[in-house]
Amino acid sequence: MMTGNLNGGGRGGEGPCGACKFLRRKCVKGCVFAPYFDAEQGTARFAAVHKVFGASNASKMLLRLPLHKRLDAVVTLCYEAMARIRDPVYGSVGHLFSLQHQVMNLQAELAHVQARLSTIQRFPLQSPQQMQPPSFDPAHNNEYAMEPSNLDSVWGEEHLLQDGTGDGDFQELASQFVSRYLPAVKLPACT
């Protein structure tokens, strides 16, 4: 954790800051790194900053900034350095592209869900109690349409009921309807 020890002096009895510890030098009063790189975790963070930017360049950048902006600059330097070490080619830009891609995917998914929701709101599904059983007049019964072999070709394809969109209620309703009114038809089990 980066501390905001803004008294800016040497570390007194605490020992050197993480940056001076890494550089193996004495931490003097007024050390620019002391408020931001503590002795415990600051050494590893400063090692990354030193590897990517160099201690001298990091020091110059911090000294040019007003005190109230230095903490943000150190956080940014550490993030950029760690990202550059993880991905030497793209650095933090690779992470930004990944996040932008994730945002675009989530926006597309949201639009899809909103479209499905508006469709469902316009055409609400009826519950099994509200459904009227079809009237089957034996005089007009089409034997060809009701033969199990013909219905199996219509209902036998699993993707008709399971399109992967999460319509579990609709699939259950369809299964109940088929089992009640078309007992000869065997539907694939819902997963």
Swiss-Prot record:
Protein family: Belongs to the LOB domain-containing protein family.
InterPro entries: LOB
Tissue: Expressed in shoots, roots and floral tissues, but not in stems or leaves.
Family matches, as Pfam families: LOB (PF03195)
Residues in LOB domain copies: 15-117
Protein name as annotated: LOB domain-containing protein 19
Organism this protein belongs to: Arabidopsis thaliana (Mouse-ear cress)
